[in-house]
């Protein structure tokens, strides 16, 4: 296959029983035992020590045979191609074997299978010409530990959201923004997670698993632990805290009675691809999202295309009502006419068009009766989920892409791009890893007691987005995705821009006056530590929460909010776009508040900026001074390490110097030189 840009064909080097696989921006080294011993992102090592298996057998710590020059069990490359390299490895203790299969994809995703089994007998022992030591195959513990450099893992994100149990007996409570933030200063534990990312503002390591099949933690609420050990932060996965439930025979007979137990998971270093030097990839206007409009879009937009152009819009995003039948690919006569008209009018003015598609099947779809049972996502009771209501009157129910709907979706996207010449697609939460229990299309699994458990189709979503990326990228298009409170780093390689922030809106729209949670913002909304640019969602509820306040919160972190109303928010962002367009962002260095030496003499003010050096060697700054609190700051003086002496407030168009006031949750956009 042809590797899509910006990715590169995989390369592998083998030396001293180790194999280093080079992925764009990252390097993974698999050791002689099949375990990852080095993970580098942007040239920086993430691991403090090799990944290890910690086991206790028959009451004693396991000791693994590490003498690979003599034991003839060193890891090897099973297969290699431009898009995937597979490395197999093995570990053996006195009683047990762990075989591993590590698959590294060109996007940097590393799928790992571990197979645990009793140690076998030699040929001589089988034929009775050598003694076979009597042995009890009892396994008391099997943990996987990933030792990270503590300085490389200061932030975290987890999905699904939950409380964190802390070492002092307290809990970090669950809330709308508790899924991300600063890694606790003390040891912490959590239930099983499908996605867990540990990193900082520049890079990190994601861990993932579609289910906890075969896991037996002593306490399910503490299946995963974050353990501090000096300069290390150890990610501990408690795979087994007791003998596997499927091993029911007497341990003395385990050599043949116990069958292999498999654990499936993976890791992915971030950023997943190079972050663009110009992260503001378009000036997007999103119609009918949050700020709802009456009538059909063809009528709402009539006579306004020139206005969009004049205000700097380069991308028009159509929300769900563009399509009479929610998310369906076969368009009605009116919908086809509407889309053709909007695309034609926009293209005349150099504006791209991205229509909405979501994650549901509508009762209005002519194929509802044919597809509903085949593609529905079901809960543990077998019931469909969802039921979104919209006009024309219909209900929309959640689909599972680990079904025939994957192919249906991809074929539909390809045909729409070719027939209507759309410039990509806006996808609402399609990357969300939903817990599905439908064994009819391959989700879910039964434990030894016959209980049904759900699974997350992470690999299916990655595969689907990989193919969608090929479809859209080859036609010069863009994939724009809305995500709500989660970071699916498996799909981010195939996304051009993410739209985050809806969960934060719930609190702000109701009048929340807490200081901006900077740790949360840096963990989840930056984009730079993941590899794809971000825009910020802003739903106004004046006077409690305004678009200006959303601008302040986001611009401090190098991202911009997306306007969703043709008057005020768009008029404001039109001015912001002009400011950003006039500054040489692509030739500038991003200097965020958490690393720069800019100072403010008020504790609630933070400063980030872009620094450009002109041909004479003089610095020019596009700076953002932000009040992170709800209370006004009457007077603050800011300073920069660069020799700048004057500052102009770019939205007001006047010189303000380096001393000024700031309303609650407000910002000054300054040009300083």
Regions found by a protein language model. Name each.
Residues 293, 297-298, 339, 344, ...:
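Active-site-adjacent "subsite" loops/lids of carbohydrate-active enzymes
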Residues 658-673:
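C-terminal beta-strand-rich structural cap/linker in extracellular carbohydrate-active enzymes
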Residues 17, 22-26, 31-61, 92, ...:
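Beta-strand-rich recognition/accessory modules
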Residues 457, 462-650, 666:
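Active-site-proximal substrate-binding groove within the catalytic cores of carbohydrate-active enzymes
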Residues 2-9, 13-94, 101, 150-172:
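Acidic-aromatic substrate-binding/catalytic surfaces of carbohydrate-active enzymes
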Residues 401-491, 513:
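Active-site neighborhood of glycoside hydrolase catalytic domains
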Residues 1, 6, 107, 111-226, ...:
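Polysaccharide-binding surfaces and accessory modules of carbohydrate-active proteins
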Residues 299-323, 419-420:
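Catalytic domains of carbohydrate-active enzymes, especially glycoside hydrolases
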């Amino acid at each position: 296959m042809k590797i899509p840009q910006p990715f590169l064909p995989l390369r592998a080097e083998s030396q001293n029983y180790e194999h280093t696989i080079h992925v764009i921006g990252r390097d993974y080294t698999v050791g002689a035992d099949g375990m990852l011993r080095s993970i580098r992102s942007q040239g920086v090592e993430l691991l403090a020590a090799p990944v290890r298996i910690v086991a206790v057998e028959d009451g004693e710590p396991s000791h693994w045979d590490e003498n690979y020059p003599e034991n003839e069990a060193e890891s090897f490359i099973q297969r290699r191609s431009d898009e995937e390299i597979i490395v197999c490895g093995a570990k053996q203790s006195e009683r047990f074997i762990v075989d591993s299969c590590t698959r590294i994809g060109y996007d940097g995703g590393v799928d790992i299978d571990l197979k645990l089994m009793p140690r076998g007998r030699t040929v001589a022992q089988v034929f009775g010409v050598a003694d076979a030591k009597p042995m009890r195959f009892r396994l008391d513990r099997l943990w996987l530990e990933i030792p990270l450099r503590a300085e490389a893992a200061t932030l975290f994100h987890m999905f699904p959201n939950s409380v964190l149990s802390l070492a002092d007996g307290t809990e970090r409570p669950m809330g709308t923004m508790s899924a991300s933030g600063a890694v606790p200063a003390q040891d912490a534990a959590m239930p099983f997670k499908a996605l867990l990312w540990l990193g900082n503002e520049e890079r990190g390591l994601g861990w993932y698993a579609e289910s906890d099949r075969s896991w037996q933690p002593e306490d399910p609420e503490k299946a995963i632990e974050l353990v501090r050990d000096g300069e290390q932060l150890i990610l501990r996965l408690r795979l087994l805290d007791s003998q596997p439930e499927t091993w029911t025979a007497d341990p003395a007979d385990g050599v043949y009675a116990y069958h292999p137990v498999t654990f499936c998971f993976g890791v992915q270093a971030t950023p997943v691809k190079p972050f663009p030097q110009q992260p503001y990839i378009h000036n997007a206007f999103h119609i009918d999202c949050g700020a709802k409009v009456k009538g059909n879009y063809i009528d709402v937009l009539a006579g306004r295309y020139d206005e969009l152009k004049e205000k700097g819009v380069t991308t028009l995003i159509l929300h769900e009502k563009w399509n009479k039948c929610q998310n369906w690919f076969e368009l009605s006569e009116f919908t086809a006419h509407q889309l053709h008209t909007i695309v034609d009018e926009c293209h005349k003015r150099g504006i791209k068009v991205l229509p909405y598609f979501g994650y549901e099947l509508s009762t209005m779809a002519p194929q509802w009766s044919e597809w509903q049972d085949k593609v529905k996502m079901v809960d543990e009771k077998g019931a469909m989920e969802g039921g979104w209501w919209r006009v024309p009157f219909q209900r929309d129910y959640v689909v599972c892409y680990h079904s025939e709907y994957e192919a249906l979706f991809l074929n539909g996207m390809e045909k729409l791009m070719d027939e209507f010449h759309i410039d990509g697609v806006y996808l609402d939460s399609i990357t969300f890893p939903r817990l599905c229990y439908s064994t009819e299309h391959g989700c879910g699994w039964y434990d030894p007691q016959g209980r049904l458990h759900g699974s997350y189709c992470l690999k299916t979503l990655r595969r689907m987005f990989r193919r969608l990326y090929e479809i859209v990228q080859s036609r010069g298009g863009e994939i724009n995705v809305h995500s709500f409170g989660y970071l699916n780093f498996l799909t981010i390689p195939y996304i051009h821009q993410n739209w985050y922030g809806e969960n934060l809106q719930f609190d702000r729209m109701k009048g929340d006056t807490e200081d901006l949670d900077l740790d949360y913002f840096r963990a989840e909304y930056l984009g730079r530590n993941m590899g794809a640019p971000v825009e910020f969602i802003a739903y106004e509820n004046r006077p409690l929460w305004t678009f200006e306040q959303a601008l302040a919160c986001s611009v401090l972190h190098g991202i911009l909010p997306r306007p969703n109303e043709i008057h005020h928010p768009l008029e404001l962002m039109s001015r912001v776009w002009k400011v950003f367009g006039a500054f040489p962002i692509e030739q500038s260095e991003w200097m965020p508040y958490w690393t720069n030496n800019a100072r403010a003499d008020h504790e609630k003010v933070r400063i980030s900026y872009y620094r450009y050096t002109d041909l004479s060697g003089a610095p020019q700054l596009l700076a953002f001074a932000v009040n992170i609190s709800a209370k006004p700051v009457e007077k603050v003086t800011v300073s920069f390490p660069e020799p700048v002496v004057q500052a102009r407030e770019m939205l007001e168009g006047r010189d303000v110097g380096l001393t000024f006031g700031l309303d609650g949750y407000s910002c000054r956009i300054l040009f300083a030189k």
